[in-house]
């Protein structure tokens, strides 16, 4: 029994923003643990490369283009998954955007609206569109990738932080609403991870050294650090966990 705690065999996972970074690592990890994976992002060619990598390792996956800012595109993502694999067991809402760096008082309305739409509303849409299918799974789950930015005030990233705090509340509310359908809903709040999305932070030597010195584990994170948590939250090992956002930040939030 214990050897199967983390297996996802014959289950189907949708991962958004899966062409690179955390999303790619999550897609690869789900496939390595037996899931059939739908790899989605706006870049179909990049998604196909992830599918090819999964296939080369003996896994099964399919690529499709999806724009999280458009509800009809997400409807097509759900339809594609059902047409290709016939079921949905796990949804990982990883895709997000941050088009603005600076104080909230200076953010243009269109940039703020984009953040709210792509980081909050899209996750609501995906959960709503997929839940009636995930409810048919004996072990259905939804995971929303948030950020430790949603736990505290963050200079320069205020709008992004607001959206990520909202994602944590979305996790709590969805867990209550979907629990009776045997769907677990959880979040992951990464710290600084070495991805293109966060390159402006970790590629700055001064910022990176400050972060590493302040972090108990003395390093920034890797996409694989987050991928393992996503497998855990989809697997039997987390069967009694819902409504929680797991912090994966090397311990930096406990240092003040």
Where do the protein language model's features map onto the residues?
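Substrate-binding pocket helix/loop in short-chain dehydrogenase/reductase
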Residues: 102-104, 108-116, 211
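Conserved glycine-rich cofactor-binding loop
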Residues: 12, 19-21, 43
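Short C-terminal tail/terminal secondary-structure segment
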Residues: 2-5, 101, 152, 230-231, ...
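Residue(s) in the substrate-gating loop at a strand-loop-helix junction
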Residues: 147
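Alpha-helical segment proximal to the catalytic Tyr-Lys
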Residues: 132, 176-180, 239
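Short, small/polar-rich loop/turn modules that mediate ligand/substrate recognition or access, typified
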Residues: 139, 179, 184, 241-243
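Active-site helix of classical SDR
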Residues: 127, 163, 171
């Amino acid at each position: 029994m214990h050897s199967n705690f983390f297996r996802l065999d014959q289950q189907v996972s949708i991962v958004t923003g899966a062409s690179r970074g955390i999303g790619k690592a999550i897609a690869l990890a789900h496939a390595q643990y037996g899931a059939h994976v739908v790899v989605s992002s706006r870049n179909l060619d990049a998604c196909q490369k992830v599918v090819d990598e999964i296939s080369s390792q003996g896994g099964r996956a399919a690529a499709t283009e999806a724009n999280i800012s458009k509800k009809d595109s997400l409807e097509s993502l759900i339809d594609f998954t059902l047409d290709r694999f016939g079921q949905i067991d796990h949804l990982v809402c990883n895709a997000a955007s941050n088009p603005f760096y600076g104080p909230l008082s200076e953010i243009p309305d269109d940039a703020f609206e984009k953040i709210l739409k792509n980081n909050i509303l899209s996750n609501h849409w995906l959960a709503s569109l997929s839940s009636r299918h995930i409810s048919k799974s004996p072990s259905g789950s939804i995971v929303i990738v948030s950020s430790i930015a949603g736990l505290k005030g963050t200079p320069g990233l205020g709008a992004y932080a607001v959206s990520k705090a909202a994602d944590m509340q979305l996790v709590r509310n969805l867990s209550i609403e979907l629990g009776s359908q045997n769907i677990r809903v959880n979040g992951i709040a990464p710290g600084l991870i070495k991805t293109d999305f966060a390159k402006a932070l970790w590629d700055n030597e001064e910022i990176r050294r400050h972060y590493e010195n302040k972090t108990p584990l003395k390093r920034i994170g890797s996409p694989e650090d987050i991928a393992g948590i996503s497998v855990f939250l989809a697997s039997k090992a987390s069967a009694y966990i819902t409504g929680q956002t797991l912090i994966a930040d090397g311990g930096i939030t406990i240092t003040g």
